Amino acid sequence: MERGQVSKLGQFLPLDNYKPISAADIPDASLDMATIYIGFHHCPLPQLPAFIDSIHRTLRPGGTLIVRDHDVRSPEMATFVSLVHTVFNLGLGATWEVDAGDFKGFRPIKEWADMLTAHGFTPVGKALFQPNDPSDNALIRLIKN
């Protein structure tokens, strides 16, 4: 592939602090695939169910949801990935106050898969892990029931 051959596809929609995606922005059953990369753990817990349901609403039956998130199965890993986030935020110029207010609801990837299953998705295959990634980012695929 030569440089410059890939053009921009689609339209950018701001995350809007994990508010449910409106049908005006993305109509029902209009997407074949959605991706959430290192994002679910930042969603405030009271907003998580409605946000997940809105993703489900946008996908066609059999549509794919790709999720990448930390597989946090111990307090030590939670501390480590929190530190990784703090360093990342500070590298972007975020203040300590902004970083301290950044919600980080880390959990095992199996819990994410179970939660998504409860909202109408089915996991497909096994979680993939990048070799030598100390923050245990897992990549999972789910399909809309």
Question: Language model features by range: what are they?
Answer:
Residues 1-23:
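Class I SAM-dependent methyltransferase SAM/SAH-binding core
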Residues 8, 30, 61, 120-123:
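Short loop/turn motifs at secondary-structure junctions
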Residues 22-34:
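A short acidic, Gly/Pro-enriched loop at the edge of an enzyme's catalytic core
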Residues 31-47:
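A short SAM/SAH-binding and catalytic strip from SAM-dependent methyltransferases
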Residues 49-61:
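A short glycine-rich, Lys/Arg-flanked "PGG" loop and its adjoining helix->strand segment in the class I
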Residues 68-131:
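C-terminal alpha-helical "lid/dimerization" subdomain adjacent to the S-adenosyl-L-methionine
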Residues 138-145:
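C-terminal lobe and adjacent flexible extensions of AdoMet/dcAdoMet transferase-like proteins
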